Amino acid sequence: MDALGRYYTNDIISTLLISNLKTSKPKRILDLGVGDASLTIAAYARWEKAKYFATEIEPKKANAIEKKLAFIKVLNCDTLQPNASTKLKVKFGSIDIAICNPPYARVENKERYHGLFKSVGCKDFNNLTRITSEIVFFAHNLKLLKYDGELGIIVSDSLITGKEFKIFRETIFEKFNVRRIIQLPDKVFNKTEARTHIIFISKSKSTNTTCELLNSTIQGELSEKIIVPNKLLIERMDFQFYKANIQIQKDAKTLKQIGGVIKRGKFSYKELRESDVPFFHSVHFKENGVKICFETAVSKRLQNFTANKGDILMCRVGKRVVGKVVLIKSGSVVYSDCIYKITVPKSFRQILLESFLSDEGKTWLKAFAHGVCSQVISKSDLENFPLFNLKIE
């Protein structure tokens, strides 16, 4: 990394980025923060008839690139300026492909970018606790791209996995078509082990609910792709995390395999509220911890609709509480039709509870909950829930 926070792209990674773009005959290509022009040179090898535009903060380097590469027009400017995209004298919405390896640096005075973010449909970026140079470059690229134009941008691992950047991930999946994410090897850039990724995104609203994740070797060879639901990628977007979780699931016993029985409650919340029977519903998860005790006995006529000591109750439907669980330590209770009662052999109770509460378990439940407003976990999916701490022998 140089004094300006730049990691220069090596030729293999440049070729990898260019080869994964889908546009066949672009007319205009943009490279903000062109650096040593590695990305542009790789692009020219594929599309020599296109017109090339770039920015470069260092005057000497900007002049040197234009002299060396006659096909590219380089503007000497600081791309971190909120109005940088206006200085290029390129019509907004006219670029077919944007390629970018932005610098990585924290940006002060984030309020000055409010107008830029709003202009590209990303006003929620203003709610981020901090802004990095990558996000500013991202927004400038979007402003200059035409509708359905492509952006291939190299970003840091923080943007891909950091909790403080969840709003960034949520926004790009909501507003645009994130088609593919490639995780790069840790030592791909000289003099650093910084982990980086390439995001391939189109400036159009996506109808896809999933995204492709791949991993690259130092030679630029790609792994088998894995398909991950977009709503899951809001939490994190790195290939290695999801690849590891898939392997864990393959090796683990399922709820059905350990003899688990799942039953849905019979009575609605309205019916139970109008009765004089103590009951358990989705609203009660907020009031209780992981384990719960019930003191009242349930009448014999309701015993077929009750959960008892050792059972696990799960919210099967809802927006914020779907997948929440509690273990009954004592007593019995009638449960509503929004709840699953899960009964397993005693030896598996604690392992199952820990699996539900683990990061892997929460990720799994989030992936398999479906629906637009109110989300639902189906019984058939839940039967295949993997016990992450229990391997197949």
Question: Language-model features: where?
Answer:
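Conserved proline-anchored active-site loop of SAM-dependent methyltransferases
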Residues: 17-20, 29-43, 78-79, 92-115, ...
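Sequence-specific dsDNA recognition surfaces
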Residues: 119, 255-266, 283-309
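A short glycine-rich beta-alpha junction/loop motif
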Residues: 333-340, 371-393
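Class I S-adenosyl-L-methionine
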Residues: 1-68, 72, 83, 161, ...
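Short amphipathic alpha-helix with an adjacent loop that forms part of the alpha/beta core around
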Residues: 83-93
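Conserved Class I SAM-dependent methyltransferase catalytic core
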Residues: 38, 61, 127-185, 198
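A short beta-sheet element
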Residues: 303-305, 312-357
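Non-catalytic DNA-recognition/assembly elements of restriction-modification systems
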Residues: 99, 222-268, 384-393
